[in-house]
A protein has these predicted regions:
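Acidic/histidine-rich catalytic neighborhood
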Residues: 147, 151-179
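Acidic/His metal-coordination segments adjacent to aromatic residues that form catalytic metal sites
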Residues: 26-40, 92-108, 167-179
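Aromatic-rich carbohydrate-recognition surfaces in CAZymes
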Residues: 38-157
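Short, glycine/acidic-rich hinge or "gate" loops at secondary-structure transitions
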Residues: 25-33, 137-140, 157-167
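Acidic/polar, glycine-enriched structural segments that form the non-catalytic walls/loops
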Residues: 1-41, 60, 70-79
């Protein structure tokens, strides 16, 4: 296929850009280092888009760096957020800084789409481990998975009348913010 060199060039360039801008010991800003938007803050919902591909390209160490940040730096503030809001487990902030404290935002405290990311990130890295490495990995990161899941379970309420779980008080951002 005559397009193979172009595809290869694009893949190599993309990997270079992602490695140089996104693979670090802290989550990257929403737009990386090229452009500064959203106050240059880390946006945890972007971790999936910016970093999960490293597992597919056989570079899981970059995801482990992020898991270390979740465990060693962000875990305690995330637990405080969940407790302050009346939930179990850990609630990962939407927009943050290197110390993992919530950054000022008129909507960030209400968003939860970043919640499942540490669980999936841990699974992606775990799948790359040998059996001996996997046991240590589970020991090191199982609390992130368990406490994230606890928050997610405590965030919903069971509606017995309709036999379903609901997220109370949730509303779409475009329906609640002034235009």
């Amino acid at each position: 296929d005559s397009r193979a060199p172009l595809l290869e060039r694009r893949v190599v360039l993309s990997q270079y850009l992602m490695r140089s801008q996104e693979a670090q010991h802290y989550p990257a800003a929403e737009t990386g280092l090229t452009y500064n938007t959203w106050y240059g803050k880390f946006h945890l919902e972007m971790v999936m888009w910016h970093s999960f591909h490293f597992a597919v390209w056989n570079q899981p160490k970059y995801l482990e760096w992020l898991l270390e940040w979740y465990r060693d730096i962000a875990f305690a503030p995330a637990r405080e957020i969940a407790q302050r809001q009346g939930f179990e487990g850990v609630r990962w902030m939407k927009m943050t800084d290197p110390s993992a404290f919530e950054a000022a935002s008129n909507i960030g405290s209400f968003l939860v789409w970043q919640q499942p990311h540490p669980i999936y990130m841990a699974e992606l890295v775990w799948r790359t481990k040998t059996s001996g490495e996997a046991e240590k990995f589970l020991h090191d990161y199982s609390e992130i998975v368990e406490e994230t899941a606890k928050f997610m379970a405590s965030y919903v309420n069971y509606d017995a009348e309709n036999d379903r779980y609901v997220i109370e008080g949730a509303c779409a951002a475009n329906e609640s913010l002034d235009e």
